[in-house]
Amino acid sequence: MLSPEAERVLRYLVEVEELAEEVLADKRQIVDLDTKRNRNREGLRALQKDLSLTEDVMVCFGNMFIRMPHPETKEMIEKDQEHLDKEIERLRKQLKVKVNRLFEAQGKPELKGFNLTPLNQDELKALKVILKG
């Protein structure tokens, strides 16, 4: 039987470990999805170089190659890219929340600048106008 102090420390360590595992799992998933996104980008680039739109192309699905029409293949890869972009963005947002919870559990201050978001095109144009003018 553990003392109340030892139980409290044990609960704290378990909580921190669980949060850290979630952070690491999300990071790993982001890396895996980014790798897939890069492979898709390579495939799209190869399709752009191949100017014969009438011929079918060979596409690898897992461990199987399938012959598909060029336009359908390009459209399918582009849709997959959009899905991967959305999934990676969702995971990154989740990761920020999980890292903040982990830091909070450890008693560390929140990361400065961690919640920054990039400027969109309109904001960037407005900033350039202000700086020039």
From Swiss-Prot:
Disulfide bridge map: none
A single Gene Ontology CC term: prefoldin complex
Gene3D superfamilies membership: 1.10.287.370
Record-stated family: Belongs to the prefoldin subunit beta family.
GO molecular function terms listed in the Swiss-Prot or TrEMBL record: unfolded protein binding
Source taxon at top rank: Eukaryota
Record Pfam families: Prefoldin_2
Spans traversing the lipid bilayer: none
Compartments (UniProt record): Cytoplasm
Position of the signal peptide: none
The organism of origin for this protein: Bos taurus
Coiled-coil features, chain-numbered ranges: none
SUPFAM superfamilies (UniProt xref): Prefoldin
Task of the protein: May play a role in chaperone-mediated protein folding.
Keywords: Chaperone, Cytoplasm
Organism lineage: Eukaryota, Metazoa, Chordata, Craniata, Vertebrata
Self-association state and partner proteins as the record states: Component of the PAQosome complex which is responsible for the biogenesis of several protein complexes and which consists of R2TP complex members RUVBL1, RUVBL2, RPAP3 and PIH1D1, URI complex members PFDN2, PFDN6, PDRG1, UXT and URI1 as well as ASDURF, POLR2E and DNAAF10/WDR92.
Biological process terms in GO annotation: protein folding
Entry protein name: p53 and DNA damage-regulated protein 1
Gene: PDRG1
